[in-house]
Every structure is written in C-alpha cells, then in structure tokens.
Amino acid sequence: TAGAQQAISIGLMATLAMGDKILVEEPGYRQVHKIIDLLRLDLDGVSVREKVGLDIEKVLSSNAKALYVTPSNQYPMGTTLNTEQRLKLIDWANQHQSWIIEDDYDSEFQFAHRPYTSMQGLAGKLGFDDRIIYVGSLSKVMFNGLRLGYLVVPESLVAKCLEIKDALTGDTVSHTQEALADFVRE
C-alpha cells in the first residue's frame, strides 16, 4: 500500500459498515480518527495510561465491531501490551466476532525488553487469526519518504482488500517496491 495509513483505511473499509462501533486508543494516532470520521464509524475511545497501558477491561466489556490498537509501542504513550493482554484481546475478538486492526507501529524499536510476538502471530498459532488485520510500514525502519505499507489479512478478506486497493489507487508504485526488494536482498 501507499503507507500504513492507506493499509488501515483498506482494512477498515473491508470489515466495517457505516455506524459500526470501533474502539480506539486515547490518546492515540490522530490520523485514524480522520479515517473513522470519513467512513462514518462510531468511535469509542479507550484510555491508555502511562505505565499501565490500554484499559483492557473496557475492551473486554464492549460489544464493538472492531478495535484499533498499537500493541507493541503505543503511540504516543510508548506502552506495550504483554502476551497475556494480547491473548485476552484475541479471545474477546473471537467471542464477539469483532475485528482487531493491529498497527505494529515501531515494533522493531524495543529497548526495555525483547519484542513480543504480534497479536496476529499469536492468534495464528492458536488458529484464531481470522479476526485480525495486521498493518505495518516500511517507512519507520527504512526511511520516511518511502511510503510503503502493508497489511496481512485473513484469506476471506484478500479479494475484498485487493478490490478496495485497486479502486482507491490502483497499483502501488512498482519501482519503489522493486528498489526496496533489491535493498533487502543485498
């Protein structure tokens, strides 16, 4: 995709309908609010506190259709969800047939501990990854002007996400992708 923001947009468009409730970290990534407003989704903020992190109990008691979360390095608070918290959220999504949009923002930069397995990876090990959309960006790890993002979706959403991507922008610039592939190979 043309960056993580486009990947988030595609994921939300593929899974939610106007009026659906989505839980979003507060404070959090402000650009996601613009996407939610544009799609006319019902935004419900979930507090993120210093050192404590996301209010997991609010999520677990919600009947929202989706949760947008940055579990590895929450922006802007910098908190991280541990494995137990991630598993609780995965269980919530499966029980409620809700979606988790996991924005793996800055997960490569961990200084206090080893990186945790992504929620999408954990769910896959349990056979429950059909409710998680994993979003990433190469802009943070490579260089900001790259504007290449990606999303990993359940098989059931691949065709719909490709259709949305094609309708929005057609192909992502292939020479940028090819240059990155050459860089990675070297």
Describe these PLM feature segments.
Residues 131-186:
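PLP-dependent aminotransferase class I/II
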Residues 1-97, 101, 108-109, 114-127, ...:
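Conserved core of the PLP fold type I
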